[in-house]
Amino acid sequence: MLVLLLLVLLLAVPPRRTAELQLGLREPIGAVSPAFLSLTLDASLARDPRFVALLRHPKLHTLASGLSPGFLRFGGTSTDFLIFNPNKDSTWEEKVLSEFQAKDVCEAWPSFAVVPKLLLTQWPLQEKLLLAEHSWKKHKNTTITRSTLDILHTFASSSGFRLVFGLNALLRRAGLQWDSSNAKQLLGYCAQRSYNISWELGNEPNSFRKKSGICIDGFQLGRDFVHLRQLLSQHPLYRHAELYGLDVGQPRKHTQHLLRSFMKSGGKAIDSVTWHHYYVNGRSATREDFLSPEVLDSFATAIHDVLGIVEATVPGKKVWLGETGSAYGGGAPQLSNTYVAGFMWLDKLGLAARRGIDVVMRQVSFGAGSYHLVDAGFKPLPDYWLSLLYKRLVGTRVLQASVEQADARRPRVYLHCTNPRHPKYREGDVTLFALNLSNVTQSLQLPKQLWSKSVDQYLLLPHGKDSILSREVQLNGRLLQMVDDETLPALHEMALAPGSTLGLPAFSYGFYVIRNAKAIACI
């Protein structure tokens, strides 16, 4: 009877694997920008300029501010169909917003408060229209006004971000030279308003033939960027403004050739090389894709291809992910906006920093599709909370980390110096973040020299009956949600006793701050 009872108890305990961590604390293997985790707004938001006014909602401002500092890229497919018209009247919503910005906040708020409520009720229909247009691959020109630029710049700067604005590259003269006349008008207005903006030209030129029937080679695109650099130098404000490009898509054979040709003719005109990456097609993606080591590892191959081209043409140029997410085509419904998407997002952040990518721009902070950080009602999704923890805990210096285990691809670990701006931590502390892609609990054993150190655990688990397909997440057992429209919750750690193993449940991820680690690389 006793033997039977012991057998039952053993079977009731979840299976567990133990892996030893190998951590390099003596010197960093690289460093990333303080704006490493940055955001995007898809330019399709301006298809109906009324909805740009949503950016003044206090809740969206609070959520964005939590992820600062960073860059906010306004770009995407619609970039190459935006026409600036400085003479077009603002929409009613934009006029109310301008009134709000010009007056005392308390005085103007009652009139402005009507705007977001009305727009939020209309947004779901607009989102469907945008997704339908994207799937039909039918694109038409959209006019943007001075008010649209005003709102974008105000949202970015007031939230702690630098706006990166994508100019239309499909405006062409005979002979396929870029027609910069509309860009001159836009630059002139922004300079007049003293808007501190960085710039791009075009979006995924490797797909221009599909989108518009026009094919432009990399050499010509390089000349276009040189021309844009000359235009910027005509404005004292933009003489040293940052210019990024070429914003190519996945580095397949044709795209690699396009990028290589561009770098030879225009690589010296840009400050950083930008490219885009998605793991899978949103229409056909499965839950298994989000948990597959093979799918996650494919990102490393793409990085290798892009870095190789850059080093062979303009050595030393920084490389950015100018747009990225889990699945292209607006994301994978019921997957890209759930807890399971965090495996792709956290692994991408870790691998990008380890392989030398300087900035990663997440598509999108808010907008149409399933891959956003904030839903249509401004409720933060699991990837938002994951991003918030990353911003709070992870510093810019990258350290080496690995696991000693037969299948080392399923527990995936990354190590950085802890964010020095965090009030609880000090120089020499390190932050480990880890993913468990297996269906059993993974125990991570720290190296012996760290057994005496205290560890703060920040374990993220799905909340509710939907398990890893949940749109809610809990931190150390507490549901994460905003306190009110202007207040993010406190992110409470769970202190682990010195010598504890780091227990990572099946299909989960989390952060571990090793206090008083005295890592030489972080001092």
UniProtKB/Swiss-Prot annotation:
Active site: E204, E323
Processing and modification events after translation: N-glycosylated. Proteolytically cleaved to produce a 60 kDa and a 45 kDa product.
Region listing for Required for transferring proheparanase to the Golgi apparatus, secretion and subsequent enzyme activity and for enhancement of PKB/AKT1 phosphorylation, in residue ranges: 507-523
CC terms in the record's Gene Ontology section: extracellular matrix; extracellular space; membrane
EC number in record: 3.2.1.166
GO biological process: angiogenesis involved in wound healing; cell-matrix adhesion; heparan sulfate proteoglycan catabolic process
Single annotated GO MF: heparanase activity
Reactions this protein catalyses: endohydrolysis of (1->4)-beta-D-glycosidic bonds of heparan sulfate chains in heparan sulfate proteoglycan
InterPro entries for the chain: Glyco_hydro_79, Glycoside_hydrolase_SF
Cystine crosslinks: C417-C522
Keywords noted in UniProt: Cell adhesion, Disulfide bond, Glycoprotein, Hydrolase, Secreted, Signal
Segment forming the signal sequence: 1-18
Record keyword Glycoprotein present: yes
Assembly and oligomerization: Heterodimer; the active enzyme is a heterodimer of the 60 kDa and 45 kDa proteolytic products.
Functional note: Endoglycosidase that cleaves heparan sulfate proteoglycans (HSPGs) into heparan sulfate side chains and core proteoglycans. Participates in extracellular matrix (ECM) degradation and remodeling. Selectively cleaves the linkage between a glucuronic acid unit and an N-sulfo glucosamine unit carrying either a 3-O-sulfo or a 6-O-sulfo group. Can also cleave the linkage between a glucuronic acid unit and an N-sulfo glucosamine unit carrying a 2-O-sulfo group, but not linkages between a glucuronic acid unit and a 2-O-sulfated iduronic acid moiety.
Protein name: Heparanase
Native species: Gallus gallus (Chicken)
Gene: HPSE
